[in-house]
């Protein structure tokens, strides 16, 4: 069977198309790709911030994310996606005060994307004037609907407070100030009838920071009392990755 006659312009047309395709791909710089991915993300209603949700919805998202994390089934995330959009501002769904322990990262523990959490970290997850101001900023200017104090199992700062309390441990530098802030929680835990002293002290420390947040920061207090925000406490279990609300 004879072959069909070839169009002499066929190869040149293919070459031209290939050149155009190559140029189009080359034009997709990381910034262009990032913009495209950001544009593909769902957006809230016009005029509404991405975090304009009820405190209960924010908490629901955090706990659902933790369930995924604990089950080792986190969402697939491209941490560069949305970078260009994040240049324009932030709209986190929760502000979290957590311990500085390297084994605890709230973004991973709650399986949240970059920009979703407003995180402050300090050994023992204890409040200070600077941290109170950070939470006031988050609530007043970022519209954050949920504030969480997040302790964790086996907290070294709380354990040091127990040893200082029971064994008169001598600590160097500024550590006595840090441990001194945790001491009231240890004293309260000593009176508890059930559970071990470390676990009880960790939970009590979280509760006390939550109580302080509700009254010590005027902006946060006002928003909490008007039910614009909620303030909760939780403990992260390092062996299992699970977060338990208190």
Please give the residue ranges for each predicted region.
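N-terminal secretory signal peptides
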Residues: 1-14, 25-27
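Short hydrophobic/aromatic-rich motifs at helix boundaries and adjacent loops
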Residues: 9, 105-108, 182, 192-193
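Twin-arginine (Tat) signal peptide motif
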Residues: 11-18, 34
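Divalent-metal-activated hydrolytic enzyme cores
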Residues: 20-22, 26, 31, 39-89, ...
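Short beta-strand segments
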Residues: 97-99, 121, 148-152, 232-236
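Active-site cofactor/substrate anionic-group-binding motifs, chiefly glycine-
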Residues: 100-125, 130
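Gly/Ser/Thr-rich loops at beta-strand to alpha-helix junctions
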Residues: 102-103, 153-157
């Amino acid at each position: 069977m004879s072959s069909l006659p070839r169009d002499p312009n066929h190869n040149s047309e293919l070459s031209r198309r290939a050149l155009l395709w190559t140029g189009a791909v080359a034009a997709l710089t990381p910034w262009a790709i990032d913009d495209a991915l950001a544009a593909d993300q769902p957006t809230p209603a016009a005029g509404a911030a991405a975090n304009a949700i009820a405190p209960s919805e924010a908490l629901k998202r955090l706990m659902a994310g933790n369930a995924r994390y604990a089950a080792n089934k986190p969402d697939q995330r491209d941490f560069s996606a949305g970078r260009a959009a994040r240049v324009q501002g932030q709209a986190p769904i929760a502000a979290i005060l957590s311990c500085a322990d390297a084994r605890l990262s709230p973004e991973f523990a709650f399986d949240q994307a970059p920009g979703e959490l407003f995180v402050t970290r300090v050994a023992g997850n204890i409040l200070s004037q600077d941290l109170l101001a950070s939470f006031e900023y988050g609530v007043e200017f970022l519209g954050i609907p949920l504030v969480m104090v997040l302790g964790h199992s086996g907290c070294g700062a709380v354990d040091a407070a127990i040893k200082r309390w029971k064994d008169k441990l001598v600590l160097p530098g500024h550590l006595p100030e840090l441990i001194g802030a945790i001491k009231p929680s240890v004293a309260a835990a000593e009176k508890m009838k059930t559970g071990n002293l470390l676990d009880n002290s960790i939970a009590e420390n979280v509760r006390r920071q939550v109580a302080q947040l509700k009254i010590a920061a005027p902006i946060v207090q006002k928003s909490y009392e008007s039910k614009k925000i909620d303030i909760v406490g939780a403990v992260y279990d390092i062996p299992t990755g699970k977060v338990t609300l208190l």
